[in-house]
């Protein structure tokens, strides 16, 4: 994503946002909400002028509109974000209109920007500079390819060759060739994962056949295959070493720490009421919030109070396992500096 601050005063102002990927649209779905003012160039029906009482045709022309947002919907499978609301500026003021935002579609958002919003924009901008991480889980006869979106792992395809039983060298070479053809266009980092020696042989194959890609590749030993291998890769901190700071890896580590402290009755609070109390006492060091609560006024108040007392606020995506686990314990948790009664 590209971002440009147009005007800002005491956290209120206009930021111009240019989404470039599906990840960016997902980020926008959490940055834009009801009550925000969004400006964009869009198409709207304009009646052609005629001498007749009824117009012969209706044209759609590009117009610049400002919309008071009422509803935001992220459509992952159509690569689209829908922003619906009431026109405040432009043609047909007070009428309803829906913006269909896709990659390459520029919008300007006017609102009060919370620190958690600015942090999300920073992550989105940084991620665009790295390129998307792909993980290839390799076993005998099969390779599964995943793309690591900001909201979680996305299955891309499964490559097969021969059978997992009794595979010979020729079959394995065929698998490697087909898999490399599939990931050859990857421009970001590549992680090759899996148990045993097959993943190591594939990594060596890539080094010989695609040295440029090999320069962005790392091989990782995992116990599981497929999506389970992806989870292990993230949990092992491999992505941190590849990118320095990928939010997914941080989510896994933080949520693991929350669950460990709950199991050992350590310095932790969970559930929005307990987290609010911890923040009020000044005991909260890191506050975790599920993205599903970002539209909740009560949760928003807790987030703002946490930021005022300099607690770190981390928003977890419920599209991915750590966010699902957080959602299951009330959608909010806090790692504390000390235990409170």
From Swiss-Prot:
GO terms for molecular function: endonuclease activity; metal ion binding. Its cofactor is a divalent metal cation. The keyword Cytoplasm applies. InterPro entries: eFR1_2_sf (IPR042226), eRF1_1_Pelota (IPR005140), eRF1_3 (IPR005142), Pelota/DOM34_N (IPR038069), Pelota_arc (IPR023521), Ribosomal_eL30-like_sf (IPR029064), Transl-rel_pelota (IPR004405). SMART domains: eRF1_1 (SM01194). It holds the Pfam family eRF1_1. Transmembrane segments: none annotated. Keywords: Cytoplasm, Endonuclease, Hydrolase, Metal-binding, Nuclease. One of its GO terms (biological process) is RNA surveillance. One of its GO terms (cellular component) is cytoplasm. The keyword Nuclease applies. It is found in: Cytoplasm. Gene3D superfamilies: 3.30.1330.30, eRF1 domain 2, Pelota, domain A. Monomer. HAMAP family: PelO. The N-terminal domain has the RNA-binding Sm fold. It harbors the endoribonuclease activity. Belongs to the eukaryotic release factor 1 family. Pelota subfamily. May function in recognizing stalled ribosomes, interact with stem-loop structures in stalled mRNA molecules, and effect endonucleolytic cleavage of the mRNA. May play a role in the release non-functional ribosomes and degradation of damaged mRNAs. Has endoribonuclease activity. This is Protein pelota homolog. The lineage of its organism: Archaea, Methanobacteriati, Methanobacteriota, Stenosarchaea group, Methanomicrobia.
